[in-house]
Structures are given as structure tokens and as C-alpha cells.
Amino acid sequence: MEKIKIEPGTVQETLVIPLYGRKQAMDRYPDIFMDHDCQEIFSHVSFQVSDQMSGKIGKIGSLMGATRQFDMASVCRTYLKDHPKACVVNLGCGLDTTFRQVDNGHARAYNLDFPDAIAARNELLGDRERETNIACDLNDLSWFEQIDFRPEDGIVFFASGVFYYFKTEDVKRLFSAMAERFPSGKLVFDATKKKGLKSMLKVWLKGFEMKDISVYFSVDDVAVLKGWSSHIASAQSNGYLEGYRPLDKRFGFITNMVFRHLDKSKMCQIIEIDFAKKG
């Protein structure tokens, strides 16, 4: 298979940065991170690993990325316990394979992203039973019609590292429409405070020479999200780094101290939104 070349400074590069991070985490801690697919996928991608990605900041970033995927998988598994036939929808999927970690043999997966990302996904991952890849712009709500939603079965959406790049008014419109269209569903995504967006630009995006990409959306008060729509039943913020399981001592004292600060300060959050029941 010819390797897919990822050009630096593009949105497509965001496909590979978390992929490489999860690979690093898997290489170091194979007993606690379960994304075995990332190691295989990365062997088929042509990508220049920067010194920053392979250094200390890269190590911290890899742990954060792998932990984020663990968090998303945890929320999906919990939802599937009560809704075993639910749709599991990966918003801005890139090369993420979270569904393969939570698949119970009955749920149905939908992976959504821009056409070029879906093309790369199709080439590297191919089709799997009960998985559908949809090329779309999330802001074009016509993708709703491509989801075979059955209210009695339920639906859970997750988005990893996606909404930072959306303008707040677009996020509000999307969330409100989703809550109305998919009653009793659930949405989980990661977020930061407004102050955290500046750190993202300085440390991560510009550090990886992704200078043409901007970030907009942040969450300083999760209660604001609930007020966006009467179809949103609840919204809560959980710790990103130790909200779903304890930190591992092997990460190191300093790293864990930094992670605890990021959670406590809400610089790193996992947001869970429950959509109201119909009627």
C-alpha cells in the first residue's frame, strides 16, 4: 500500500498528530491504553515527526491524547450498557477508531469528517460491519438524514479535538439542532477555557507549524450550554485527565502535578451533554 502523505501546516495534519500521540502512549504503556489500531495505521502514513512531538511536550501531548480517547470510550461504553443498539457517532473522526474499542456487536457506528479525511480513512481502514463513513461538513446539517436514528435504540455522539476550531455561534446552532433531532441522545467532547485557547495556539498549533489554523470555541461556564436549548436536559464538566480513572504513577510526579492542575483549573475538560426526551 502506498503511504498517504500528510502535508505540514494543513488541517489534515490534525489527523496524524493525535494518531502519533496515541501511538507513543501505546508504545510506552500498552497495558493501560487500548488503541492497537493506531500502531498499524501509522505504518501507512508518511509524516515528518517534529522534534517537539518527540520531546517532552510531545510526551505530555501523547498522554493527553490517549487519555482523551479513553474518556470518550468510557462515556460511550456507559451509554451502550443501557442502549446496546445505539448509534455511536464520531464527529470529526479523522483516523480515530474508538468504536472498535467499545463495539458490543450490536451498536452501529457513523464516522463523519471532511471528504479528504474520509478518503484517507477509507484507504487506511476500509469498511467494517456496522460502520458507515460519511463525508460532510458538520455545519451542513443535512448529514442528520444519513443517520439511521431509531429513538428506541438511542444515540451517542463524541468529538475529540473538534469544536475548538468552530465559532461559538456555529457550535450553538449545531448542538441545538442535534438536541431537537435526536431526543434522549448524548454528546461528549473535550473543551478548554478561553484562556486555554491562547495556550493551544502558542504551544500546540504554532509549535507544530500549523500557523494557518485558528481556534475559537471555549467553555468557561458549562451551565451556559444547557441554556442554549430547551431540548438540552443537562450539561456537566468532568476532569479530562483524571475524571474517568486515576492518573498512573508511571507518568511521573511532575507530569501528574501538571495534569491535576489542568483539570482543576478547567483548562482541560470533558463535557457531557444529555438531550431531553421527546414530548
Q: How does the language model describe each region?
A:
Residues 142-152:
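Short amphipathic alpha-helix with an adjacent loop that forms part of the alpha/beta core around
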Residues 213-239:
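Short alpha-helix
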Residues 156, 178-194:
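Conserved beta-strand signature within the Rossmann-like core of class I S-adenosyl-L-methionine
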